[in-house]
Regions:
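Cytochrome P450
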Residues: 1-278
Length: 278
């Protein structure tokens, strides 16, 4: 396994489709493994492309201004619980509501359990339980709706490896919650911990940009080189090629860049603004 730390080289690899991601175990029958095998993050080629298109279609239905307003409202209501609890719960709950989950306020706890397992896929009974609950909530929230399914017919690869009892969109909706928990919650908490957060003259956008550049919530990702070498890409390493500040790689780069960057920033900005206004 090779560590890649220089940001220019990390960006080059992220932008090169010849570098694949490690794929999930599509043969496993564990619920968390089946979920992992049904998302875009751990798929390559045409399967990844189909799932990515569907993720983008789901996100296109979420108005970022409405999302920010909901995040601000939930933050105000949860303010007595403290900033850490707000950061852990609000991003997942407001996104779950917009994505049509049944009982969105109950989603943060199982999402946290599944997110702990998500990057590695190591066997986890709590993750299996959480995956079962979340997939059921994703389905239940849509069983009486006319959901738009453009690009997700049975032959597009969206549901490959998931199982016949899991519709094509449920795993992708859960994927968005899991990745929001890991990235957006961490972004909020880190921004609020910055000393500059206590200075009302410093815009929230500057706080978020600082965290994303210098201390991204998700600091590593993995790729498989064309020669089979396993690579660990560090998103927070040095950037000797940049004449000014280091480039920001928190949302990735290239064809697998985070599809929900605007949504994450809308939620984080609203939450941090509300907490700082206290």
């Amino acid at each position: 396994m090779t560590d890649v730390t220089e940001r220019s080289e990390v960006e080059r690899i992220l932008e090169d489709p010849a570098f694949a991601v490690p794929e999930a175990d599509a043969a496993s029958r564990r619920p968390a493994d089946r979920f992992r095998a049904g998302v875009s993050r751990f798929a390559n080629g045409a399967t990844h492309a189909a799932r990515r298109r569907r993720l983008e279609a789901l996100l296109a239905q979420v108005d970022v201004d409405d999302l920010a307003a909901d995040a601000a409202s939930r933050t105000t209501a949860m303010r007595p619980a403290g900033a850490e609890e707000v950061a852990a719960r609000v991003p997942v709950a407001c996104l779950a509501a917009r994505l049509g989950f049944a009982d969105p306020d109950a989603m943060p706890a199982p999402v946290a359990a599944l997110a702990a397992y998500y990057p590695t896929g190591w066997p986890s009974a709590p993750a299996d339980t959480a995956a079962t609950l979340l997939l059921a909530a994703a389905r239940a929230g849509h069983e009486h709706t006319d959901d738009v399914r453009a690009g997700s017919d049975a032959g597009d690869g969206v549901g490959v490896g998931v199982g016949v009892d899991l519709d094509h969109d449920a795993a992708l909706r859960v994927q968005l919650l899991v990745q929001a928990h890991a990235a957006t919650a961490g972004l909020i908490a880190a921004a609020l911990r910055l000393p500059a957060a206590r200075d009302a003259d410093v815009p929230t956008s500057d706080l978020l940009a600082t965290v994303l550049r210098d201390a991204p919530p998700v600091r590593q990702t993995r790729r498989i080189a064309p020669d089979g070498d396993a690579l660990v890409l560090h998103l927070d390493g040095p950037d000797h090629d940049s004449p000014h500040d280091p480039r920001t790689l928190a949302f990735g780069a290239g064809p697998r860049a985070c599809p929900a960057g605007a949504h994450a920033l809308a939620i984080a900005s609203a939450v941090v603004d509300e907490v700082r206004a206290c």
